[in-house]
A protein has these predicted regions:
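Positively charged, solvent-exposed patches that mediate nucleic-acid binding
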Residues: 1-90
Length: 90
């Protein structure tokens, strides 16, 4: 488990040569569907760009706290930081 200010990443090694991601953005944390979907798109894009270093891992990313959509670069950067941590330690 890797954590940042607003995201949590669960990682499990798997015996395949690809990486997968699951996203949890609960309605309890972010009420508006438009904002939940925007956050998921940002995290998916970060995953797509860094998929090579996560080969052989199942990842689940969870939004821990509400965030402002104006902070989309911060969400993206936190996701990338967590992917980097996971790739280095596993």
């Amino acid at each position: 488990v890797f954590e940042s200010l607003s995201l949590r990443l669960y990682v499990k090694p798997i015996d395949v040569d690809y990486a997968r991601i699951g996203l949890i953005v609960a309605k309890r944390v972010e009420r508006k569907a438009v904002r939940r979907n925007r956050i998921k798109r940002l995290i998916r894009e970060a995953f797509r760009r860094h998929r090579q270093m996560l080969m052989g891992l199942d990842c689940v990313m969870q939004l821990r706290h509400p965030v402002e959509l104006l902070d989309s670069t911060r969400i993206y950067q936190e996701a990338v930081m967590l992917f980097n941590k996971a790739a280095r330690q596993l």
